[in-house]
Amino acid sequence: MGKGDPKKPRGKMSSYAFFVQTCREEHKKKHPDASVNFSEFSKKCSERWKTMSAKEKGKFEDMAKADKARYEREMKTYIPPKGETKKKFKDPNAPKRPPSAFFLFCSEYRPKIKGEHPGLSIGDVAKKLGEMWNNTAADDKQPYEKKAAKLKEKYEKDIAAYRAKGKPDAAKKGVVKAEKSKKKKEEEEDEEDEEDEEEEEDEEDEDEEEDDDDE
């Protein structure tokens, strides 16, 4: 998204960001002419935040929730300037894309591989899963493929209902056009499915990496 686009929605703020903003405003009122040492100020804010009770943090969390809702609402109607691509905004209420047969297979066998080879990196685990899937017989793949097909069928029904609910007038007007472009749309959605699955696997791997770091 364009850095200089004035119509671009302001990014959502976290509860801690709202807290720091409040601290900054308080500091300006008390010391209007004093310059702020950013690193020292940040350190003091961080220490103060750690000692605050959940009740005290509550108002900042409410502010963050309200700002998140504002951001999501504005992003739905935001159109980036021509020639500029924007990352697709994902509505949290939209039906989630179904996993592929391979993704279901990975979900089942990933914990087993990590248990047997605790020293393996995320990349090596993914590589091993790929090798296992390629060496799995077609008959053994069927349960995953059947489950994936059922989940995809359910998703298609859910997304159709979701889209119809969101744009009833557009759905009525575009019946003829939709029929013509149905095949193309399905192909695009299949490509999106693959992209989203890769994103989901990346996110899952990142989460696992963070968990490993915490341990």
Swiss-Prot record:
Effect of S42A: Greatly reduces phosphorylation, nuclear localization
Effect of S39E: Cytoplasmic localization (phosphorylation mimicking)
Region of interest (LPS binding (Lipid A)), residue spans: 80-96
InterPro entries (UniProt xref): HMG_box_dom, HMG_box_dom_sf, HMG_boxA_CS, HMGB
Region (Cytokine-stimulating activity): 89-108
Effect of D67A: Abolishes cleavage by CASP1 and impairs ability to antagonize apoptosis-induced immune tolerance
Membrane-related topology note: Peripheral membrane protein
GO cellular component, one term: condensed chromosome
Sites of ADP-ribosylserine modification: S181
Result for mutant: S181E: Cytoplasmic localization (phosphorylation mimicking)
Effect of mutating S46A: Greatly reduces phosphorylation, nuclear localization
Residues that bear Phosphoserine: S35, S100
Induction conditions: (Microbial infection) Protein levels increase upon infection by human coronavirus SARS-CoV-2.
UniProt: heparin binding residues: M1, G2, K3, G4, D5, P6, K7, K8, P9, R10
GO molecular function, one term: lyase activity
Record comment regarding domains: HMG box 2 mediates pro-inflammatory cytokine-stimulating activity and binding to TLR4. However, not involved in mediating immunogenic activity in the context of apoptosis-induced immune tolerance.
Function: Multifunctional redox sensitive protein with various roles in different cellular compartments. In the nucleus is one of the major chromatin-associated non-histone proteins and acts as a DNA chaperone involved in replication, transcription, chromatin remodeling, V(D)J recombination, DNA repair and genome stability. Proposed to be an universal biosensor for nucleic acids. Promotes host inflammatory response to sterile and infectious signals and is involved in the coordination and integration of innate and adaptive immune responses. Nuclear functions are attributed to fully reduced HGMB1. Associates with chromatin and binds DNA with a preference to non-canonical DNA structures such as single-stranded DNA, DNA-containing cruciforms or bent structures, supercoiled DNA and ZDNA. Can bent DNA and enhance DNA flexibility by looping thus providing a mechanism to promote activities on various gene promoters by enhancing transcription factor binding and/or bringing distant regulatory sequences into close proximity. May have an enhancing role in nucleotide excision repair (NER).
Protein name: High mobility group protein B1
Taxon lineage: Eukaryota, Metazoa, Chordata, Craniata, Vertebrata
